[in-house]
Amino acid sequence: MSTQIPMDPPKFLCMPARPLVVGLAVFGAIRSFVQFWMSSGFGMAGTHFCVLLLDLLLLFGAYKNDVFALKWSQRVTFACVLIAIIRFMIYPVVFASYMASGLSRNFTGIDSEEIEILGNVTTPEQNFVFGMISGFTLEFATALSIGVESLKYLLVHRLWEYAKATEASSSSRYVIP
């Protein structure tokens, strides 16, 4: 008579955790690739490339679904959370300063609709408001990024615990003579 406790695969709300992690990793890899492709500076391209590699490692770990790969995926998602926090501290301030100072009007790679919007902003007060709104918008987006990366970390941790428990239960079958 077996007295095993049934273990259900981990879930987030009603969704299974593993397909959700795979989906988030694929979305993150695509997003990072697009940001890498469209970045103009070496520093920005480097951070996007690092996040792209980390998302691909996370995808491998979620696909492989063993204890070792999931532990490394957990470390990778922790690194992504740290990168998102660093982005949260730097990007909104730089972008808001760029917009508020009026330097954005000197950029030649913008569309005619954006030129019309920027052309109507002429006073220092309007520059300040424009910079503040753009900074808060970017701050919201980076805070959302931190939330998604933290959710991935939580899900990978649950998957790792589940894989560890199922591996331990499958290897601890005693043969009673």
Swiss-Prot record:
Principal location listed in the UniProt entry: membrane
Subcellular location: Membrane
Positions of transmembrane segments: 19-39, 42-62, 76-96
Lineage of the organism: Eukaryota, Metazoa, Ecdysozoa, Nematoda, Chromadorea
Gene transcribed to yield this protein: glam-1
Presence of keyword Transmembrane helix: yes
GO CC, any one term: membrane
Membrane topology summary: Multi-pass membrane protein
InterPro entries: Glam1
Name under which the protein is recorded: Glia associated membrane protein glam-1
